[in-house]
């Protein structure tokens, strides 16, 4: 869980920008989207193999 404390004399927009940056760095949002629905292990393996094939060519 990302946590951001608003500093003294810091605008809310700046704090929100720091929070968004920390969330994107940790990959929290991507992980939540990935785990939103159950994915069978066979489908997961298929996606992983397709991604590897895409990287190779």
UniProtKB/Swiss-Prot annotation:
GO terms for biological process: translation. GO terms for molecular function: structural constituent of ribosome. GO terms for cellular component: ribonucleoprotein complex; ribosome. Residues 43-57 have a biased composition (Basic residues). InterPro entries: Ribosomal_bS21, Ribosomal_bS21_CS, Ribosomal_bS21_sf. The keyword Kinase does not apply. Keywords: Ribonucleoprotein, Ribosomal protein. Residues 35-57 are annotated as: Disordered. It comes from the Bacteria. The keyword Heme does not apply. NCBIfam families: S21p (TIGR00030). Belongs to the bacterial ribosomal protein bS21 family. This is Small ribosomal subunit protein bS21. It comes from Bacillus licheniformis (strain ATCC 14580 / DSM 13 / JCM 2505 / CCUG 7422 / NBRC 12200 / NCIMB 9375 / NCTC 10341 / NRRL NRS-1264 / Gibson 46). The lineage of its organism: Bacteria, Bacillati, Bacillota, Bacilli, Bacillales.
